[in-house]
A protein has these predicted regions:
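Multi-pass alpha-helical transporter architecture, strongest
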Residues: 43, 131-167
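Intracellular juxtamembrane helix-capping segments at the cytosolic ends
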Residues: 77-90
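Loop-to-transmembrane helix entry/capping segments in MFS-fold secondary transporters
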Residues: 92-102
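Residue-level signature of mid-helix packing/kink "hotspots" within the transmembrane helices
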Residues: 3-11, 110-111
Length: 167
């Protein structure tokens, strides 16, 4: 199910990126991740609230499935929009190099993220570790504030023109 919603997230946010731009769309994917993690964290209170307010008889597992669907949308959208941003900012002549760095740092982030979550789970329990993930996604929003998307694309184009001219 997560793979299907990840595909859906990649397609939907790809279309959204064409309208809103890469930076804003990437910020939205990070906010979607935060919402998904909050949904996971608050599954039991959300289940109780939905049951009480709407007269439903949901089980926590059903609400958790919804949180999993949000996670899938988040996964597919953030990966596709992130790669598209790298592609926009990478001069064609250096695209392989920059995508190589992208891949390396993605793998390092996964390693340190798992280590951090594992350490925090050991120290504070699973729920504390889940909240750590929210912190990581919130921190990822900060560098986006300084990115000038038009300037990045223009710089990549100038670098390509310089490479073609032999500069």
């Amino acid at each position: 199910v997560v793979q299907i919603t990840a595909l859906l997230g990649a397609v939907l946010f790809g279309a959204l990126q064409g309208r809103l731009g890469g930076r804003l769309t990437y910020a939205l994917t990070l906010l979607l991740w935060i919402a998904a993690i909050l949904a996971i964290y608050f599954v039991e209170p959300m289940t109780a609230s939905l049951n009480a307010r709407l007269g439903l008889a949901l089980h926590a597992e059903q609400v958790f499935l919804f949180a999993g669907l949000l996670s899938g949308l988040s996964l597919g959208s953030s990966q596709s929009v992130g790669r598209a941003l790298v592609g926009m900012f990478a001069p064609e002549s250096r695209a392989a190099e920059l995508f190589g760095f992208w891949g390396l740092f993605s793998k390092l982030a996964a390693i340190f993220g798992i280590f951090g979550v594992g350490l925090l789970q050991w120290l504070f329990g699973l729920q504390g570790a889940v909240l750590f993930c929210i912190l990581l996604f919130a921190l990822a929003l900060l560098p986006l504030l300084a990115i000038d998307e038009a300037r990045g694309v223009a710089t990549a184009r100038r670098a390509d023109e310089g490479a073609r001219a032999g500069v």
